[in-house]
Structures are given as structure tokens and as C-alpha cells.
Amino acid sequence: LALVPSLSLAVLGLLSFGVFMGAIDVVVNIHAILVEQAAGKRMMSGMHAFWSVGGFAGAGLFSLWTATFGLTPLQSTCIAAGIIVTLILIIHRYLLPYGGGDGGALIAIPRGIVIVVGIVAFISFLSEGAIMDWSGIFLTEVHHFDLSLAGMGFSLFSGAMLIMRFFGDVTVHHLGQKLVVLGGSVLSVLGFLAIIFGEAAILLYAGFFIIGIGVANIIPVFFSLLGKQNVMPISLAVSAVGTFGYLGILAGPAVIGFLAHATNLYAAFAFLAALTALQGILAAFVYRKMGV
């Protein structure tokens, strides 16, 4: 991507990058489920926390290399690639040599309770995508914040998610996964209500932070839950739910944009609050159905 001379090649490169990243995302989650099962204790939230750390580190280091040290995008990319390859060479011997079941279907079509888990993932990722793209516009256009503060909403949301994922496994151990997921859904709804009805900056910031706390461990907990269902092989179940999640993060900004254009951003965020409430209802259904 740092070398492509045309837009068409850049699009092709990004498409290829997305395909391989999607495949890696599915595989590492399958690996995490198998490691968690073998260890006999909860580890998924912590693993997702390190995924968040990687995202922060990648964005932060790339900015540091280009802005502070004056490196070109190609030089920065080569350094990042070198770090990744080095880490892979160090840890590859510790990776499991087997997958999550015998499923080898070309397309992972969800069945049974996996469909409901997929919808929960869709809603969770949709909300994340919407906040990522629209929180800044909401703060600057609706509440007239300075442009320098446009990223505060998403930064607080992401920071809260990172913190809660590091403490997620301990929290789930003490409170139980059902309370964490259902309580997280309630917190997220309250966060959206604070954003919708709040006027003071502190209340708006608190709303984004609370949403981050609420949604942080929903996806890790449900990925762990996929290891306990027997409707589909783990590999296919994770792939199917991951597909729902990617659809959500793609649809989120577009859905909010459509609603904001048709009505306003208040109504769009109210729609997210309603979806989050539905997410909690679906989560309760999953737990009742699986007897967890």
C-alpha cells in the first residue's frame, strides 16, 4: 500500500489486506477458545484487550515514526512488518497445531443459537462502527465542540473498552458472564441516553465512557460461549459470528448516516440505544436457551 501508484491498485491492496486480516481474526479467536478450554479458566477478555493494545500501538507508533522522526510511510511500514515477523518467529512454536472441529465448509452458514449470537455481534460491532465515525460529528456539529475535541468521544469509548477488557476475566469470574453481558447492555443504554439528553461536556464524555464499559466484554464472553455450543463446529461458528460482526461495523456508519439525514443525530443515537436494549434481550435468550 505504501508503494501503489494508482487508486485501483490501492483498492485491490486494501481488499486483499482485509481478506487476510479477516481470516486471521477468525483463526486467532478459534485459537483463543481452544486455549481457554485447555486452561480451564477465563482468558478471552484479556486476549481481546491485547488486540486493542495492538490497535493503539499500531496507530500511535506509525504517527510517531512519521510525524516525530520524519520517516516515510514505506519506512514505517517496513519497521512495522519487521516487528510483526519477529514476534511471529518467536511465538509460532507455542501455537496450537489443530483447529476447532472438523468443519471444512467453504461458507460458514450459521444455524440455531449461533444465529442469535451472530445478531448480538452484529449489533455490538454496528454500535462501535457508528461511534467511531459519528461521535466526532455529533460533538462538533450538534454540540459545537472545537474540532480539536472531535476525537474525545471515541477516545474515551476505546479507552474504557481497553481498561474493562483487561479486568474482564476477573469481573466475569466474580460476577458471572450473564450479569456482565446483561449489565453491560443496561450500562450501554444508559450511556446512549446520557449522550442523547446530556448538554454538559462532562455528561457527554461520561456517556461515551459508559458505553465503552458496557460493551467491552460482550463480544469476548460470547466468543467463549461459542466453545460451549454443539450446533456447529467451533471453527464454523466463530467464522459465522465474525462475519455478522464485520457486517455490523460496515453497516453502522451507513445506517447512522441514513437516519441522521432523514431525521437528526439524536434520533440516530436513539436507534442505537434501542438496538443495544434488543442486544440485551437476545443475550438473555441465548443464556436461557443454552442453560448457562
What are these regions (language model features)?
Residues 1-5, 187-199:
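C-terminal ends and interior cores of transmembrane alpha-helices
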Residues 8-24, 203-216:
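Hydrophobic core of transmembrane alpha-helices in multi-pass small-molecule transporters
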Residues 15-16, 111-127, 209-213:
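Pair of pore-lining "gating" transmembrane helices in MFS-fold secondary transporters
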Residues 22-37, 217-230:
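Intracellular juxtamembrane helix-capping segments at the cytosolic ends
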Residues 66, 164-176, 260:
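Helix-to-loop junctions at the C-terminal end of transmembrane segments
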Residues 74-92, 269-285:
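Symmetry-related core transmembrane helices of the 12-TM Major Facilitator Superfamily/SLC fold
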Residues 133-149:
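Short amphipathic helix-loop junctions that connect adjacent transmembrane helices
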Residues 147-155, 235-239:
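Small-residue hotspots at the loop-to-helix junctions and early N-terminal turns
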